[in-house]
C-alpha cells in the first residue's frame, strides 16, 4: 500500500504542469493539522508528539516539479483561523517550516473548518479543511516484545492513516510515520484511495513497557479549497488520533 501511495504521489508531481511562473504556479503549501482524543487523566510530555492539537505548514517555491523541497520559503506570514480559535500566528521553527501548538492556543474541534492563510512576498494564499473525528480503531491491548501491530479502522473513511507510538515508562517516542518535510507531507496527503489499516512494525515495541499508540485518519482538502498556490502540488489534511494503551510484558 505504501508503494502504491508513493507511485500515486509521483504521478501527481509529474502531472503538475510544465510551467512554474507566477505566484499561483510556483508556491507550494503543505499543511497537516493533528489532534488527539485524550482519555480523561492521561497526559503525555511534548516529546511524545501526541499533542491535543498541532499544525505544521511547509512552504516552498517550485523550480522543478520533481523536487518540491528545492527552495523552502522563509519569512512568510502564516496564520490559522477557526471558529474555536480566532486568529493565531504560526512560528517558523525551521527554514520553510511553520508550527502552531495547543500551548499557543490551538484547539482541535471535530466538525469545525480549519483555515490556514499564508503570505509570500505580498501575495496571499489559503487552504481549508473540515476537521474529522478520531477513527474507531482496533489495536491489541497486549503484545509480545517485537510483535507487529496491525491497526484496523472499524468506523470512518480516510485517505490515509497517521500513527505514533510512545513508550510511557521510558518517555521515548519509538515510532511514527509523521512527515518531516514538504515532500513527505505531500506523499502522505496525496492519496485518493480509502485506507483502513496500518502496519506498525515490531521495532516500536522492543522492550517490556506500557505504550500509548495514537492512530488518526486523514481527511484531505479538496483542490477547490486551496487558493493562491500551486493547486496540483499543495495539500492540507487533518486527523484526530484515537489513543490506545498497549502493554508489552517481560518474557
Language-model region placement:
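Ser/Thr/Pro- and often Gln-rich low-complexity regulatory segments
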Residues: 11-121, 126-132, 162-166, 187-191, ...
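Short helix-loop boundary/capping segments
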Residues: 133-196
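Sec-dependent signal peptide recognition
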Residues: 1-3
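C-terminal motif of bacterial Sec signal peptides marking the signal peptidase cleavage site
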Residues: 6-9
Amino acid at each position: 500500500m505504501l508503494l502504491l501511495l508513493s507511485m500515486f504521489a509521483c504521478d501527481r508531481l509529474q502531472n503538475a504542469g510544465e510551467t512554474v511562473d507566477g505566484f499561483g504556479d510556483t508556491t507550494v503549501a503543505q499543511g497537516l493539522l493533528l489532534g488527539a482524543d485524550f482519555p480523561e487523566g492521561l497526559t503525555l510530555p511534548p516529546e511524545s508528539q501526541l499533542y491535543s492539537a498541532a499544525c505544521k505548514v511547509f512552504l516552498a517555491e517550485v523550480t522543478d516539479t520533481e523536487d518540491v523541497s528545492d527552495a523552502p520559503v522563509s519569512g512568510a506570514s502564516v496564520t490559522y483561523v477557526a471558529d474555536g480559535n480566532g486568529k493565531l500566528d504560526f512560528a517558523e521553527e525551521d527554514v520553510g517550516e511553520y508550527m502552531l501548538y495547543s500551548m499557543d492556543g490551538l484547539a482541535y474541534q471535530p466538525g469545525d473548518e480549519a483555515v490556514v492563510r499564508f503570505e509570500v512576498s505580498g501575495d496571499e494564499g489559503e487552504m481549508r479543511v473540515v476537521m474529522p473525528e478520531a477513527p474507531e480503531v482496533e489495536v491489541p491491548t497486549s503484545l509480545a516484545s517485537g510483535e507487529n501491530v496491525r491497526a484496523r479502522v472499524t468506523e470512518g473513511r480516510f485517505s490515509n492513516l497517521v500513527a505514533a507510538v510512545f513508550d510511557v515508562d521510558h518517555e521515548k517516542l519509538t515510532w511514527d510515520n509523521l512527515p518531516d518535510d514538504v515532500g513527505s507531507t505531500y506523499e502522505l496527503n496525496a492519496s485518493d484511495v480509502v485506507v483502513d489499516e496500518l502496519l506498525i512494525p515490531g521495532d516500536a515495541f522492543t522492550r517490556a513497557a506500557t505504550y500509548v499508540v495514537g492512530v488518526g485518519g486523514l481527511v484531505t482538502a479538496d483542490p477547490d479549497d486551496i487558493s493562491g498556490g500551486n493547486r496540483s502540488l499543495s495539500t492540507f489534511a487533518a486527523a484526530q488520533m484515537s489513543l490506545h494503551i498497549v502493554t508489552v510484558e517481560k518474557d
